[in-house]
C-alpha cells in the first residue's frame, strides 16, 4: 500500500482480516526525490503509517526502498537506510532505480534531463545496504530482501521456490508447476464475466526448458541458491552437468560457489545476479 493510504480505518480493517503482513512503498525519505517520483506521501507519512498499524495490532510490516536516484550520494542513501531502521519494521526490500523503456523516467534520461547513477556508486550503495541491515540483525535471504528472524515474506518465497499458487481477482496470476495463468486486467469485464459464471483468463503452458530456466532464475535469487539434487530429479543428471559447466567460470571468478548440493551466489555475485542468471538460463535452449 501507499503510506498515505494508511489511516485508522484502514489499519483497523486490516487488523480484523486474516492478513499477516502489510507492505508499504516508502521508496525514499528525501522530499526532493519523492517529488521526483511523483509520490503523494511525505517522509513523515511513513512513520505515521507504521505507528497507526502498530496501534491497530499489526506486528509484521515491510517497507520498500529505492536507491540510485540521479544526484543521490552515499550519504543520502545512508540517511535513508538509517531512517528505515529507526522505524523498527520486520522486513525491508530495496531496489535500484530502473529506466524502463516507455516510462517518463526513460524519456527524461534520453532527453538528457536526468543522468543515470554511476554503476560503481550503485554497487557501493547496494553493499552498504547489505552490511548495515545485516549488522542490524536482518537476514539477507534474497537478492533485494531482508527480514528479521522468522519474518521472511512467505508470499514471495513461494514464487522463488516454485510452489504452486492461485491468484484471485482481476489481473491475478496463478502457477501450477506446469503452466502460468493470468486473469484479464479489465476490472468491469472481469466482474461481468464472473457474474456469468466464467473466469476470463489466459494460459501459457511451460515446456521443460522454460521450467528449467524458471528454476535457475528464481532459485538463484535466494541465498540458498539452486538445489542441484532437485534439478536432477526434475530435469535429469545431464541438466545438472550442463548447469555446472556453465557455472564454472563464475565459480573461478568468485561470483558463484558450490556448497554441498547447492549452487549459490556469493556476496560478490549478488550485485551482478541478473547477468549470472542470464548465462545459466541458456541451459536447455
Predicted regions: what they are:
Residues 228-229, 241-242, 258:
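Extended hydrophobic-aromatic, low-complexity segments
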Residues 237-251:
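Short amphipathic alpha-helical interaction segments
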Residues 251-261:
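A short, conserved structural fragment
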Residues 268-285:
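Short, amphipathic alpha-helical interaction segments positioned at domain boundaries
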Residues 262-266:
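Minor-groove-contacting beta-hairpin "wing" of winged helix-turn-helix DNA-binding domains
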Residues 128, 132, 249, 253, ...:
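Solvent-exposed, charged/polar functional surfaces in cytosolic regulatory/catalytic domains
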Residues 1-237, 275, 285:
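C-terminal scaffold of the Radical SAM
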Amino acid at each position: 500500500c501507499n503510506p498515505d493510504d494508511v489511516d485508522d480505518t484502514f489499519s483497523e480493517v486490516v487488523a480484523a482480516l486474516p492478513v499477516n503482513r502489510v507492505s508499504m512503498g516508502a521508496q525514499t525519505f528525501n522530499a526532493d526525490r519523492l517529488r521526483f517520483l511523483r509520490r503523494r506521501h511525505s517522509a513523515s507519512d511513513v512513520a505515521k503509517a507504521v505507528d497507526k498499524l502498530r496501534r491497530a495490532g499489526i506486528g509484521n510490516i515491510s517497507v520498500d526502498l529505492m536507491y540510485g536516484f540521479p544526484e543521490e550520494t552515499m550519504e543520502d542513501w545512508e540517511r535513508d537506510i538509517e531512517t528505515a531502521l529507526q522505524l523498527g519494521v520486520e522486513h525491508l526490500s530495496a531496489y535500484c532505480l530502473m529506466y524502463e523503456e516507455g516510462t517518463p523516467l526513460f524519456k527524461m534520461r534520453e532527453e538528457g534531463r536526468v543522468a543515470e547513477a554511476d554503476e560503481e556508486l550503485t554497487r557501493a550503495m547496494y553493499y552498504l545496504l547489505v552490511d548495515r541491515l545485516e549488522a542490524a540483525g536482518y537476514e539477507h535471504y534474497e537478492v533485494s530482501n531482508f527480514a528479521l528472524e522468522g519474518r521472511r515474506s512467505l508470499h514471495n518465497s513461494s514464487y522463488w521456490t516454485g510452489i504452486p499458487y492461485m491468484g484471485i481477482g482481476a489481473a491475478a496470476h496463478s502457477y501450477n508447476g506446469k503452466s502460468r495463468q493470468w486473469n484479464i486486467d479489465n476490472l468491469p469485464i472481469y466482474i461481468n464475466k464472473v457474474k456469468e459464471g466464467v473466469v476470463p483468463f489466459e494460459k501459457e503452458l511451460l515446456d521443460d526448458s522454460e521450467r528449467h530456466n524458471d528454476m535457475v532464475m528464481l532459485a538463484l535469487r535466494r541465498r540458498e541458491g539452486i538445489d542441484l539434487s532437485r534439478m536432477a530429479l526434475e530435469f535429469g543428471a545431464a541438466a545438472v552437468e550442463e548447469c555446472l559447466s556453465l557455472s564454472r567460470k563464475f565459480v573461478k571468478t568468485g561470483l558463484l560457489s558450490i556448497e554441498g548440493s547447492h549452487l549459490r551466489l556469493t556476496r560478490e555475485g549478488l550485485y551482478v545476479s541478473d547477468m549470472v542468471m542470464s548465462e545459466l538460463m541458456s541451459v536447455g535452449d
